[in-house]
């Protein structure tokens, strides 16, 4: 790995940790603890706290934060679970699927209509309200991160997960997703946009080849800019 790649990887890792710190209430401490663990000092910005924490972590702890477990542990059937690191004051981190509400079979949560119906209203406030309620339920159930919203473009009506998205219009998709993310994160839960660009089929999606014309890619996926 080149020096620039290492710097980029470290920057992305630090940014991810900063996001977790900013949205996870568990990252608070007393004055005494903040002295021995400077990343627990809430007077610092999330970025500053993340940088101090990353500097204190060894390689195994960094790998731990990037891997975790899937569908195992005390929070089964959560989508993902990262056990705590007590020596650093890092709490457990629970992830659940969430494009249409919290998917967690252990506890009850509201099953919202398919996001495609929100897009049919042309009203971002509806997507924002769903995001806020889903975020509040996730927080109440002990979930820190939701895998949602989904805002890939529904280019193929036969796509098995098209119902999770906001339809085929790029700008509308970006607008609805923006409102949903803001609503979700207002509850203190991390939103996760999905799925990756040109992921338009579920079967063999990790090994299939998506051939997109050079013109279609920037035109059809301008919703990414709309979200930014």
Mark where each language-model region is.
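Intrinsic disorder/low-complexity segments
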Residues: 1, 23-27
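Bacterial N-terminal signal peptides that target proteins for export
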Residues: 3-14
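Bacterial N-terminal signal peptides
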Residues: 14-24
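Glycoside hydrolase catalytic-domain context in secreted enzymes
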Residues: 26-27, 31-225
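A short, basic/aromatic helix-end/turn motif that makes direct DNA contacts
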Residues: 228
């Amino acid at each position: 790995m080149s020096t620039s790649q290492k710097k980029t990887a470290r920057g992305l890792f630090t940014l991810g940790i900063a996001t977790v710190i900013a949205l996870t209430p568990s990252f608070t401490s007393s004055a005494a603890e903040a002295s021995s663990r400077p990343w627990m000092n809430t007077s610092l910005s999330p970025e500053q706290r993340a940088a101090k924490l990353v500097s204190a972590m060894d390689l195994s702890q960094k790998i731990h934060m990037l891997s975790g477990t899937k569908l195992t542990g005390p929070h089964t059937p959560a989508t993902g679970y990262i056990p705590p690191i007590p020596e650093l004051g890092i709490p457990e981190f629970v992830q659940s699927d969430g494009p249409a509400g919290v998917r967690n079979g252990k506890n009850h949560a509201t099953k919202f209509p398919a996001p495609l119906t929100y897009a049919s209203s042309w009203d971002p406030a509806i997507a924002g309200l769903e995001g806020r309620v889903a975020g509040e339920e996730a927080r109440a159930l002990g979930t820190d991160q939701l895998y949602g919203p989904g805002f890939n473009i529904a280019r193929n009506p036969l796509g098995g997960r098209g119902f999770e998205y906001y339809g085929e219009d790029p700008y509308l998709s970006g607008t609805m997703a923006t409102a949903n993310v803001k609503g979700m994160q207002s509850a203190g839960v991390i939103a996760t946009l999905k799925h990756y660009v040109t992921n338009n089929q579920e079967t063999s999606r990790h090994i299939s080849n998506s051939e997109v014309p050079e013109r279609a890619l920037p035109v059809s996926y301008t919703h990414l800019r709309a979200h930014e």
